[in-house]
């Protein structure tokens, strides 16, 4: 029993650490709500076939990184490695045709078998946003702007937006024929991993991080040169609208993302403050995915943000806990019962109330209130309990008491006035 540990790549998060998580999540939810984006929740566990069909069998995610197993019914199941395929499945299964235009978000744990490092775990948390049924360039721009504004709202520094276009299916097919010929000619100059991708997922070679391969790729055909006039004009319109919004961008023609379902717009937002794991947000358009999975022809675009990396980058001010508003010091059988009832009443005022359950001496309870930097204290002893009243007072920064007030347990008006004048005052 003493040797039981969490699995490598998973992390226990304790209250002090979760202060920042909760503050970040609160800001995220506020921003999403203001943009009229609604929440969707899908299972963590899905049929493996969903990700093979949705993400692509030749991708690293499916071939190397998924947590897959047979359940007791001999069905192949997988812990979700990303959220878009699950959202698409949920919409198809529940009748997307009845509501084909939606803006959705989800947040929760995902699972990939990768080498753990700072900001990357095997169980990680992701915020995803999906605009379903939207095919205009304006929807691309809105979703990029939303991601950009969220990251800036969180105080993340040194942000850089990289964009590319992957064209449509015909554009990529024409490019891939030329690219495969070039790859066969230059195969020996590529790193081993890229050589193995030629037959499985050649487009991913463009995104190689190998220095030698990146240098060789400088002379490779560019997908951009195979775009139809329609795809090319779409990309020009994307850039124009980003410039109107004064969102700076850099074109990266090797940006293809790691999943097979992307079409047209692909983008990443990086932070120079993160070092090697610079990508904070990634996304793009996936107009063919829902149809490919058996649904109606439905355009869509989305992005995902890794929360672990977000937590590393978010401002220090988000680590500051909210101080206790009222600490209830109580001792004695009747006093403890009255204190419990009072704590429930006080929480209805949206106050952070802590009830001391220790039964320790008054002096020790005072020290605990001081340690928590409580804004105020309530004292209920045996005498107060007999008289049906309690003592309430503010604490100053040194922990010393201010002028106290005695309030009857039945005098809700006096209690409410004290709270409004001392704790809820702007």
From Swiss-Prot:
Per the record, what are the reactions this protein catalyses? tRNA(His) + L-histidine + ATP = L-histidyl-tRNA(His) + AMP + diphosphate + H(+)
Read off the CDD domains from this record.
HisRS-like_core
What are the recorded GO MF terms, alphabetically?
ATP binding; histidine-tRNA ligase activity
PROSITE patterns to which the protein is assigned, alphabetical: AA_TRNA_LIGASE_II (PS50862)
The protein's predominant localisation is cytoplasm
- Report keywords, A-Z: Aminoacyl-tRNA synthetase, ATP-binding, Cytoplasm, Ligase, Nucleotide-binding, Protein biosynthesis
A GO biological process of this protein is: histidyl-tRNA aminoacylation
EC number of this enzyme: 6.1.1.21
Q: Which domain of life is it from?
A: Bacteria
Alphabetized Pfam families for the sequence: HGTP_anticodon, tRNA-synt_His
Gene3D superfamilies (alphabetical) = Anticodon-binding domain (3.40.50.800), Bira Bifunctional Protein, Domain 2 (3.30.930.10)
Which GO cellular component terms are attached? cytoplasm
Q: Where is the protein situated, by its record's location annotation?
A: Cytoplasm
Q: Can you state the subunit structure given in the record?
A: Homodimer.
Give the family this protein belongs to, as stated in its UniProt record. Belongs to the class-II aminoacyl-tRNA synthetase family.
Name it.
Histidine--tRNA ligase
Q: Which organism is it from?
A: Prochlorococcus marinus (strain AS9601)
- Give the gene symbol: hisS
């Amino acid at each position: 029993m003493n040797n039981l540990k969490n699995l490598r790549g998973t992390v226990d998060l304790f209250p002090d650490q979760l202060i920042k998580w909760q503050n970040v999540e609160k800001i995220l939810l506020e921003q999403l709500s203001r943009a009229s984006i609604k929440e969707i929740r899908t299972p963590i566990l899905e049929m493996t076939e969903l990700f093979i069909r949705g993400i692509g069998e030749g991708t690293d995610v499916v071939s190397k990184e998924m947590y897959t197993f047979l359940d007791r019914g001999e069905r192949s199941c997988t812990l979700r490695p990303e959220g878009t395929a699950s959202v698409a499945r949920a919409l198809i299964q529940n009748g997307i045709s009845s509501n084909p235009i939606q803006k959705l978000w989800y947040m929760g744990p995902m699972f990939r078998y990768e080498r753990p490092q700072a900001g990357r775990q095997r169980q990680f948390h992701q915020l995803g946003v999906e605009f379903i049924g939207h095919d205009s360039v304006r929807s691309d721009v809105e979703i990029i702007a939303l991601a950009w504004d969220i990251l800036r709202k969180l105080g993340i520094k040194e942000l850089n937006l990289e964009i590319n276009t992957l064209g449509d299916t015909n554009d990529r097919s024409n490019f891939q024929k030329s690219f495969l010929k070039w790859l066969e000619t230059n195969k020996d100059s590529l790193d081993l991993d890229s050589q193995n991708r030629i037959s499985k997922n050649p487009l991913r070679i463009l995104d190689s991080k190998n220095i030698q391969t990146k240098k060789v790729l400088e002379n490779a055909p560019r997908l951009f040169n195979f775009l139809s006039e329609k795809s090319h004009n779409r990309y020009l319109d994307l850039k124009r609208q980003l410039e109107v919004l004064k969102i700076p961008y850099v074109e990266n023609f090797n940006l293809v993302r790691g999943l097979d379902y992307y079409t047209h717009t692909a983008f990443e937002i990086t932070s120079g403050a993160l070092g090697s794991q610079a990508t904070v947000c990634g996304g793009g358009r996936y107009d063919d995915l829902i149809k490919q999975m058996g649904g109606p022809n439905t355009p869509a675009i989305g992005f995902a943000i890794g929360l672990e990396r977000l937590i590393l980058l978010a401002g220090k001010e988000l680590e500051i806990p909210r101080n206790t508003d009222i600490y209830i010091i109580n001792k004695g059988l009747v006093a403890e019962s009255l204190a419990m009832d009072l704590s429930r009443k006080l929480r209805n005022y949206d106050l952070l109330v802590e009830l001391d359950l220790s039964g320790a001496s008054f002096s020790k309870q005072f020290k605990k209130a001081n340690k928590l930097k409580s804004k105020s204290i309530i004292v209920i002893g045996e005498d107060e309990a007999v008289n049906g009243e309690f003592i309430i007072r503010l604490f100053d920064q040194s922990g010393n008491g201010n002028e106290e007030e005695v309030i009857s347990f039945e005098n809700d008006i006096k209690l409410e006035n004290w709270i409004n004048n001392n704790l809820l005052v702007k």
